[in-house]
A protein has these predicted regions:
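Conserved short histidine dyad/triad with adjacent acidic residue
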Residues: 43, 49-68, 102-106
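Short, low-complexity, Pro/Ser/Thr/Gly-rich segments in the mature regions of secreted, periplasmic
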Residues: 127-133
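Ligand-binding loop in jelly-roll beta-barrel domains
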Residues: 103-127
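Glycine- and acidic-residue-biased ligand/ion/polar-headgroup-sensing regions
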Residues: 58-61, 68-87
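A short, N-terminal "cap"/entry segment at the start of jelly-roll beta-barrel domains
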Residues: 4-51, 134
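Extracellular/periplasmic catalytic domains that process cell-envelope and extracellular macromolecules
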Residues: 32-35, 46-48, 68, 75, ...
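Conserved hydrophobic/aromatic beta-strand scaffold that supports enzyme active sites
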Residues: 39-41, 52-54, 73, 98-100, ...
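Short acidic-glycine-tyrosine-enriched beta hairpin
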Residues: 45-47, 87-104
Length: 134
């Protein structure tokens, strides 16, 4: 979709991306997540605070039980999935659904679509995914 010139006097430029854009560079997920899972950094440095990423999960895959040291703000962009946070009822996400996951709250998710599920995730703290025994 390209870059849009910022109106303010700063050096940072505004930009717009879609998960299908050629400018989006996908890389592998941590090894404990399903084969074919991919991550892409949209903005920021995932080793630092305030990074935005895309997560692509193959259809029919389960994200293993895990947690993050950061809260995560999620919007499902494509596909359908169920998220199960520990101690809470499972929630079904459809495209456009927003979900908030507190730091340290373990969860699992299932992409039950035929095609991949793609999520936008905003992290406050550095990006991580820590496996948790179920």
């Amino acid at each position: 979709m390209g870059t849009v010139q910022a109106q303010a006097g700063g050096t940072e430029k505004a930009f717009i991306r879609n998960h299908t854009d050629a400018e989006v560079t996908w890389g592998p997920c941590p090894a404990f997540l399903p084969k074919g899972c991919e991550l892409a950094v949209l903005h920021g440095d995932p080793a630092k605070k305030d990074a935005d990423v895309l997560l692509k999960v193959p259809g029919g895959s389960v994200l293993a039980h895990h947690k993050h040291t950061s809260p995560e703000r999620i919007v499902l962009l494509s596909g359908e999935m169920t998220v199960r946070y520990d101690g809470q009822q499972p929630v079904r996400l459809r495209p456009g659904t927003y979900a908030y996951g507190p730091a340290g709250l373990a969860h699992t998710a299932t992409c039950f679509s035929k095609h991949s599920c793609v999520l936008f995730i905003a992290f406050i703290e550095p990006v991580d995914a820590i496996p948790v025994a179920h």
